[in-house]
Regions:
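Hydrophobic transmembrane alpha-helices and their immediate loop junctions
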Residues: 1-219
């Protein structure tokens, strides 16, 4: 409890405060290790996550989580390669898609927008989009996609929690960790805790201001 924590040694306090973030960090790194071990680094197709009801893909029987590997026998290894290939196509053109369901003939629909947006509109695909990464497990594209997403988001979420929890701001553990560490040298003055929070807020504010100024320059 809190009383035992306050009476513990500085080393014990630091271990307790670092435990949560350390576990989250290790879990995130484990997910990243599995991600890099189980999946190829280069994408090999485009995953259809959403289709427009009544659109060309929907009419052809292509469903959510299907993978497009090639168009007219030309490999497309990413959503952008798929969009680039269809850049020269026109509404009404027939295209043969090599998919995880087999070869499927699709008649392109009406085009709207420019670039990639034009390609998606002709296919009848809706965002979001993602590249397909082949798994070394060989258990099918649908399983590969869900396993990839699970590991990817596990890495992202656990790493974010670990970093956020170690921010030197109240009420995160990082604030108490830094306070406990500095208190060993500066005593138990309350001003130390306030100074840590003020300094951290200044860093965050400076980062936000610099980001805003950079965006103004880019505009």
């Amino acid at each position: 409890d809190e009383e035992k924590f306050e009476n513990a040694s500085t080393t014990s306090k630091l271990r307790v405060l670092a435990a949560g973030s350390s576990i989250n960090l290790l879990t995130g790194l484990l997910a990243l290790l599995l991600l890099s071990t189980l999946f190829s680094r280069a994408s090999s197709g485009a995953v259809i996550i959403e289709t427009v009801e009544g659109g060309p893909l929907d009419a052809a029987g292509i469903q959510r989580w299907d993978v497009i590997y090639a168009v007219n026998s030309t490999p497309v290894r990413s959503v952008w390669e798929l969009a680039e290939y269809l850049d020269d196509a026109s509404p009404g053109d027939p295209v043969l898609l090599s998919t995880s369901r087999g070869d499927i003939l699709v008649i392109l629909g009406e085009a709207s927008g420019e670039g990639a947006e034009r390609a998606w509109s002709m296919l009848g695909a809706a965002p979001p989009f993602m590249n397909y990464y082949e798994s070394r497990l060989g258990l099918g594209s649908s399983f590969n996609i869900h396993l990839y997403l699970t590991l990817y988001w596990s890495f992202t979420v656990f790493l974010s929690i670990a970093v956020m929890n170690m921010l030197p701001l109240y009420p995160f553990d990082g604030e108490r960790f830094l306070y406990t560490l500095l208190r060993r040298f500066a005593g138990s003055e309350r001003w130390l805790q306030i100074a840590i929070n003020v300094f951290s807020l200044c860093l965050i504010a400076a980062n936000m201001i610099m980001s805003f100024m950079r965006n103004l320059i880019l505009i």
